[in-house]
A protein has these predicted regions:
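Histidine-/acidic-rich catalytic cores in large beta-rich domains
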Residues: 21-355
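Positively charged n-region of N-terminal signal peptides that target proteins for export
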Residues: 1-4
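Bacterial N-terminal signal peptides
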Residues: 6-16
Length: 355
């Protein structure tokens, strides 16, 4: 244990230097431009430059980088604990709790490819961390990556598998043309107002709600074999960041992968019995199409922070890589343009943090 703590402290010290030092050259090489007025104090931008900076940058309303954290590989999600620390998912490292100095306080190492942590974390009201990981089994004579939700307590180190797709879904039926070695491609988690957990599945264009006791799926919104139908002209495709704003009111980023005409959007639905209706949407000026990644987050004042995270030409995306704060009426209050990255996985509103 002493050696483990010493190693963590040493690594934390190394990261602290990187986080508090002048902006490194590869982060400076990314051009960040902002116009307008941002409501939260900062936006946390998840950056991935294939041959450059990889990690998280805290950007103020003027586009200035106020704080940063470098990851080993893809920055796969972020949230904050009650003490104000960030919890980051680093594809090349695992889960890390990081304080404002950039020091690692707690960590959970990445696993082998068949059980790899990926794409999504969320801090629970209990101050634990839910995260997605592959859960691989044999199916039809081949290895198939399903999904599992784990719960990690950074303070005690306890790490428990809470839910797995193999127990509640059928890979022979709950699949699409995108299903190959990976079955569902989970890409976001959210704790709903009733303690339920929302999980978004890219490959079957569906959001599910898991009961608080983990013993059942409460509903399946849109996509393959839904229990809640969405009108054909309001369907989503490859959606991200599904969140239940209040009971039966769902906000998400709809990539609209493979749909025509090609544009992406933020969209909000109200669930009423066995159906859902669209009550709000927003598309970027110019019809930005982001074939993957991206996010939509509702702010406390009712505005929405929306990120289109794919560079122009990447998997058919139109670009640019940009984010907006928009009002309920659709007016743009703030715009962020990011140039020099392959992807901007998400943009999160951040208050109450002092670098």
């Amino acid at each position: 244990m002493r050696e483990f703590l010493s190693a963590c402290l040493l690594l934390g010290a190394l990261v602290t230097v990187g986080a508090s030092a002048p902006i490194p050259a590869d982060l400076q090489a990314i051009t960040i431009t902002a116009t307008g007025a941002l409501t939260p104090k900062y936006a946390l931008v998840h950056l991935f430059a294939e041959k450059g900076f990889k990690g998280y940058a805290l950007v103020d309303g003027t586009g200035r980088v106020a704080w940063h954290y470098r990851t080993k590989d893809y920055p796969f999600g972020a949230d904050r604990r009650k003490n104000g620390n960030f919890v980051f998912m680093d594809k090349g490292h695992g889960l890390i709790e990081v304080d404002r100095r950039g020091a690692i306080v707690h960590e959970l190492k990445q696993r082998d490819p068949e059980n790899e942590m990926h794409h999504a974390i969320v801090v629970t009201p209990r101050d634990t961390v839910l995260y997605l990981a592959f859960d691989t089994e044999d199916f039809a004579g081949k290895r198939l990556k399903g999904e599992a939700i784990w719960e990690w307590n950074p303070d005690t180190g306890e790490d428990v598998k809470r839910w797995r797709s193999w127990d509640f879904m059928d890979p022979a039926l709950d699949r699409s043309a995108r299903t190959a070695g990976e079955w569902l491609h989970g890409n976001s988690l959210h704790v709903g107002p009733g303690g339920n957990v929302l999980l978004s599945f890219h490959y079957i264009n569906q959001v599910i709600s898991i009961a608080p006791d983990w013993k059942s799926i409460q509903w399946r919104l849109g996509g393959v074999r839904p229990t809640i139908a969405v009108p054909a002209d309001q369907q989503t495709s490859a959606q991200h960041t599904a969140a239940e704003l209040e009971t039966n009111r769902i906000l998400m980023f709809d990539n609209r992968t493979g749909l025509q005409p090609p544009y992406s959007r933020a969209v909000e639905y109200v669930i009423d019995g066995a159906s859902a209706r669209q009550v709000w949407e927003w598309k970027a000026p110019g019809g930005n199409y982001a074939s993957a990644v991206s996010s939509a987050r509702r702010l406390s004042n009712g505005n929405t922070l929306i990120a289109f995270g794919m560079e122009k030409g990447r998997n058919g995306s139109t670009g640019p890589t940009e984010a907006f704060e928009v009002t309920p009426a659709g007016d743009v209050k703030w715009r962020l343009l990011v140039e020099g990255v392959m992807t901007m996985f998400r943009v999160e509103p951040i208050d109450g943090f002092e670098p």
